[in-house]
Amino acid sequence: MKANFSLATISKNITSSLHVGFVNISSNESTFNCSHKPSDKHLDAIPVLYYIIFGVGFLVNTIVVTLFCCQKGPKKVSSIYIFNLAVADLLLLATLPLWATYYSHRYDWIFGPVMCKVFGSFLTLNMFASIFFITCMSVDRYQSVIYPFLSQRRNPWQASYIVPLVWCMACLSSLPTFYFRDVRTIEYLGVNACIMAFPPEKYAQWSAGIALMKNILGFIIPLIFIATCYFGIRKHLLKTNSYGKNRITRDQVLKMAAAVVLAFIICWLPFHVLTFLDALAWMGVINSCEVIAVIDLALPFAILLGFTNSCINPFLYCFVGNRFQQKLRRVFRVPITWLQGKRENGSCGKSSSFREMETFVS
């Protein structure tokens, strides 16, 4: 499929969308020439790494979904969020084999325009859904530790309102991808690329706008909520006098809180920094071929790092808990009741905050 896109516009778009070099880039504000064809040797390892992430992530998230579906009785609010997070991560990871093939063919999309649009939108939708559910879980954990009495009144029906809202927000965030994603022929590279086919006359504006939207909705706002909640938990727990088992539980919670924040930052910060630099390039603020080359080289690996977040989420939110381990051994029904009774009967000196803390790490 051919289109009236300039070589400059298309070549830069592949880097922005899924990701080859910038060639003869121009915008309304600036014009500069990076005429060499970029090396793609660094892409050789990407497909293999994608398949590794797909295999590991699909396995661990399938375990989470299976255990949730097999669980009898009412579901906890936190469990509902974990389940939806695992579903979003599974759907995101399911697209990786296609993108691995895309990389192995050096950005030559062989699956047709419909699959390009569908799987491009699918990837964006579930990326946002995963990040939004991580944010919801952070708020839920903050409430359970800071306001334990109020949090005990939480019912699954409350999550039944929040979960559809989160999925709707993710769908709305992915609408530009669904509308613009298409296959375009790039004669310079000899490929049919799956790209964001913005109107040529407004290409720079659209590209910069979408990049900034990803930064704000996909990183800045969620990070504010996540960091605020977990730093609030840390501040609250450090004020609480704790001894013996309470102290061990508190330290576990603090470590988990730090791990969640650090994992989110490590996995997504590189991608969003490069996305922001890309937006600056479209706006004409950056016009250095050297900087463009760095973005071109680093973007595939930054995206790869972002996908690893879907692999480690089950470990951060589920696998470390005692209750998950009990479920995995298929003996959780009686032991959980006994354990809860033991906690209440054998810990008269515990505050409600520390009982909620034990739920946090269980």
UniProtKB/Swiss-Prot annotation:
Q: Which residues are glycosylated?
A: N4, N13, N24, N28, N33
Q: Which domain of life is it from?
A: Eukaryota
Q: Which GO terms describe its biological process?
A: calcium-mediated signaling; immune response; inflammatory response; negative regulation of neurotrophin TRK receptor signaling pathway; neutrophil chemotaxis; positive regulation of cytosolic calcium ion concentration; positive regulation of extrinsic apoptotic signaling pathway; vasodilation
Q: Which cysteines are joined by disulfide bonds?
A: C34-C289, C116-C194
A single GO CC term for this protein reads: external side of plasma membrane
- Domain notes from UniProt: Helix VIII may act as a gatekeeper for either suppression or activation of the receptor, depending on post-translational modifications and interactions with various receptor partners. Helix VIII is found in a non-canonical position, stabilizing the active-like state, but at the same time preventing the recruitment of G-proteins or beta-arrestins. Upon switching to a membrane-bound conformation, helix VIII can support the recruitment of G proteins and beta-arrestins.
Assembly, in brief, is: Interacts with MTUS1.
Q: Please give the coiled-coil regions recorded for this protein.
A: none
Cellular location of this protein? Cell membrane
Which residue intervals are topologically Extracellular?
1-44, 104-113, 181-205, 281-293
Record: residues binding angiotensin II: Y102, Y103, R181, Y203, K214, D278, D296
**Membrane topology annotation:** Multi-pass membrane protein
Q: Which organism is it from?
A: Ovis aries
Q: Which keywords belong to this entry?
A: Cell membrane, Disulfide bond, G-protein coupled receptor, Glycoprotein, Membrane, Receptor, Transducer, Transmembrane, Transmembrane helix
Q: Which family does it belong to?
A: Belongs to the G-protein coupled receptor 1 family.
Instruction: Name the PANTHER family on file.
Output: CELL ADHESION MOLECULE (PTHR10489), TYPE-2 ANGIOTENSIN II RECEPTOR (PTHR10489:SF952)
GO terms for molecular function, please?
A: angiotensin type II receptor activity; C-C chemokine binding; C-C chemokine receptor activity
Is the keyword Transmembrane in the record? yes
Ranges for region Helix VIII: 323-332
Give the matching InterPro entries: ATII_AT2_rcpt (IPR000147), ATII_rcpt (IPR000248), CCR1-9-like (IPR050119), GPCR_Rhodpsn (IPR000276), GPCR_Rhodpsn_7TM (IPR017452)
Q: List the Cytoplasmic topological domains.
A: 70-79, 140-158, 232-256, 320-362
> What lineage is this protein's organism placed in?
Eukaryota, Metazoa, Chordata, Craniata, Vertebrata
Q: What is this protein's record name?
A: Type-2 angiotensin II receptor
Give the stretches traversing the membrane: 45-69, 80-103, 114-139, 159-180, 206-231, 257-280, 294-319
| Function, as annotated | Receptor for angiotensin II, a vasoconstricting peptide. Signals primarily via a non-canonical G-protein- and beta-arrestin independent pathways. Cooperates with MTUS1 to inhibit ERK2 activation and cell proliferation.
